[in-house]
Amino acid sequence: MGRKYFGTDGVRGRVGDSTITPEFVMRLGYAAGVTLVGREQLPPGERPAILIGKDTRISGYMLEAALEAGFAAAGVDVMLAGPVPTPAVAYLTRALRLQAGVVISASHNPYDDNGIKFFSANGTKLPDALEEEIEFRVDQPMVCAEASRLGKARRIVDAAGRYVEFCKSAFPNEFDLRGYRIVLDCAHGAAYHIGPSVFHELGAEVIPLGVEPNGLNINDQVGATHPQTLRSAVLANKADFGIALDGDGDRVVMVDGDGELYDGDKLLYVIAASRQAEGRLEGVVGTLMSNLGLERAIGRLGLAFARAKVGDRYVLETMHERGWRLGGENSGHIICLDRHTTGDGIVSALQVIAALIKGQCTLATACADLVFYPQKLINVPLAAGFDWRSDERIDQARSDAELELGEQGRVLLRPSGTEPLLRVMVEGKDGSQVERLARHIADCVRHASV
């Protein structure tokens, strides 16, 4: 069965377009309620319950109400967490023994986008097959439950406080953050009232950024996708380092005291090297976009490295397949399965800091053996219906580039899971060669797509 509505991270789009409307989201909630609840064996008279969390977008209120109506029509109780990070929904769903969790967020996208993604009772993303089953039911008629079986809604008391304590518990008890000055950029997003509390309660002096959401400013020149704001604040405040989350708090990048940026690949390496030194690791999962330098540095640690498809759900699937506990993406999604069931920006940052304290080192020294290959990524818009995979000009351009790079580089062409774009990535030892080849392939795609 093909995927009609779900992309790589749930259902996502522009608010008011075909899928991000109150009507569609109500139908989606109903379909998810019927699908997920049908798999649960509950005691007689007990209704299933699903948690809903959201980020700070103004459209979240509208979509939350629509989801609530859909679940209630399916006979499902709803527990409302309010604005909390995506990983908080995963944690609370599991901790409260609920049947599923739902996040209303478009992650790092601007405020006028939004989306819906689901978590299982175990706090993991739903498998493709289950999402496809929900899609099928979305297009079927809604049959409202009898009045006596309709679901009810209530708010969770101190959902944010419970998650703060969970994050703190992921940091070693023998350490604290006293003496550290940390700039924390919460992207005016879901972690705005949570992130500062976590690091402050662990002892750090916290300089907060992006903690004044107004419904329209999420990810606007702040957060993990705009690290220049974090860098400027770190340098201006002479901080030890800075941490930037994205709008829903599931990804992280960091900046050291000198203003150097550390993306997901670098942070993943810091955690891997520390855990390997303790004999706690067998392998690391990256993605097709992970830098070759990371793969080879992980190999020098004596660890295996596997590449998953892009998307934290696929990283997690590969981790489970291989029985490994650590994986991540260069975008900043890092999954530490000994700490959480999903990617968590705050928890991942704490694992990096713990590694630095254990190794008595800085981010720069922790990454001294990690040499990145120059990488060029170009996003090329695609015309509707264009089949780039069967175009001979594009195939020839890719083959020529791969032949020229040999074993010292690679070429990756990957369609976006959320936008009509083809991502052209070239990587190799020679930066000018990489730039030239990437631009040539991108030009071929543009001309072929016209």
Curated annotation (Swiss-Prot):
Record-level GO cellular component terms: cytosol
Cofactor(s) the protein needs: Mg(2+)
In-chain residues carrying the UniProt-annotated modification Phosphoserine: 107
UniProt EC number: 5.4.2.10
Residues involved in Mg(2+) binding: 107, 246, 248, 250
Keywords: Isomerase, Magnesium, Metal-binding, Phosphoprotein
GO-annotated molecular function: magnesium ion binding; phosphoglucosamine mutase activity; phosphomannomutase activity
Function in brief: Catalyzes the conversion of glucosamine-6-phosphate to glucosamine-1-phosphate.
Protein name: Phosphoglucosamine mutase
Gene, per the UniProt record: glmM
